[in-house]
Amino acid sequence: MSKKNSKNKAGSSTIALNRTARHEYFIEERVEAGLSLQGWEVKSLRAGKANISEAYVIFMQGEAFLFGSTFLPLNAASSHVVCDPTRTRKLLLSRHELDKLESLTARQGYTIVPLALYWKECWVKVEIGLVKGKKEHDKREDTKAREWDREKARIMKNKHRG
């Protein structure tokens, strides 16, 4: 038997999305990283009990860590394992990627936030983005542009109907 040659996209097997990141930040660059997880965390991710909307990436001793994410334990979790839903999780990146991201975040106004959490085959991956915060007027401009695109689509739809 041959294997299927289907590539998993971030949207096809998504566990959690950070929807506010697109609204709050300009996304400069995207990087895929692995996560170092415990057994109960994998089980809760299979159940879809994850939240990355308040999370961000910090660098300590040359390593990258996901801070502020919440993986809720299942009710049937083992009683002899201490489940900390908000523990800091290590990101698995190459040394080259770590050095590059750490030097880019040293610049004024840049930070790294998780954009999506998803399955890639049997591995949990997190898509992180190098971002810069938006000002209030930038957010308003984006909202106006989105509303105008919606209005244009509505006009074209009605025009084609008759």
Curated annotation (Swiss-Prot):
Pfam families: SmpB (PF01668). Residues 137-154 have a biased composition (Basic and acidic residues). GO terms for biological process: trans-translation. Residues 137-162 are annotated as: Disordered. It is found in: Cytoplasm. Keywords: Cytoplasm, RNA-binding. GO terms for cellular component: cytosol. One of its GO terms (molecular function) is RNA binding. HAMAP family: SmpB (MF_00023). Belongs to the SmpB family. Required for rescue of stalled ribosomes mediated by trans-translation. Binds to transfer-messenger RNA (tmRNA), required for stable association of tmRNA with ribosomes. tmRNA and SmpB together mimic tRNA shape, replacing the anticodon stem-loop with SmpB. tmRNA is encoded by the ssrA gene; the 2 termini fold to resemble tRNA(Ala) and it encodes a 'tag peptide', a short internal open reading frame. During trans-translation Ala-aminoacylated tmRNA acts like a tRNA, entering the A-site of stalled ribosomes, displacing the stalled mRNA. This is SsrA-binding protein. The lineage of its organism: Bacteria, Pseudomonadati, Pseudomonadota, Gammaproteobacteria, Aeromonadales.
